[in-house]
Amino acid sequence: MAKVKEAKNIWLDGKLIPWSEANVHILSHSLHYGNAVFEGVRAYQTKKGLAVFRLAEHTKRLLDSAKACLINVPYSYDELFKAQVELLKSNDFKDTVYLRPIVFLGYGSMGVSHLGSPVQVALAAWEWGAYMGEDAIEKGIKVKISSWAKNSPNSMMSKAKASANYFNSQMANHDAITSGYDEALLLDQQGFIAEGSGECFFIVRNGVIITPPNDTSLESITQNTVIEIAKDLGYEVKRERITRDEVYIADEAFFTGTAAEVTPITNVDGRIIGNGKMEAITKKLQKTYFATVRGENEKYEKYLRSEEHTSEL
């Protein structure tokens, strides 16, 4: 993955501070026991300036994740929303930006129980283009169905964007990359397709777009956006379980996510998907998605928070 490109400022516990001064104690509770929640948000350059895509939904999901994980966030929705806008304004960004809000447990107690641990909040933002590279967006990627199964919702908080959940993702992703693939695709505990290591999964069969329900995965904001776009374009969309063999015979396949955006999949387990290139429906969805996040589609302008709107805060 791409190296982080340092920016000017980071927001930490209510204050904007220089990037190089954003440090935490080595005995911070979350570093040892894994209880932290975070978000991934994108901001794009538009004709109205830098615009954040679906900031309201991402901020709400951050607070919902914290609630599920028994973390009492010391800031309100409005405070966090405004802080993210102010962070972007304080940095001189010229390209696509990735925002990473994180709520974690700091230094003050040790042991499995997190009771009494101070809650800290950090907001970071840096320029970050295509998650898997521009070639992935244009030509597609190779994916491996992982031997690692998705966490059971009876074992982890599957609806929370919790740091601990991503150990499972990390192991699956590592196995895929070291096996010569670009990304992993995980099955759920019943053997149906769940999601990628950090993306939602879609297939197209006979003109119908199919994506799994969020039974064992995060309720994805990007997945929701792409479904809305697809329906508006006149496509039939089904939310139903997908088997491994259905993937192999799909006409098209693609990942969606804040980082991944809309990334075509051309190969799964060494099997060519469709004609081995990005096909018509994926291409149409990708084109419309990028037009949406870049402020070129008035229909979805409601999802953008641009520099023009900051005076309203």
Task: Go through the PLM ranges and name each one.
Residues F104-S109:
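Short, internal active-site loops enriched in acidic
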Residues M1-Y75, E79-E86, M110-E307, S311:
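Helix-start/capping segments and mature chain N-termini
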Residues K89-V97, Y235:
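Short secondary-structure junctions
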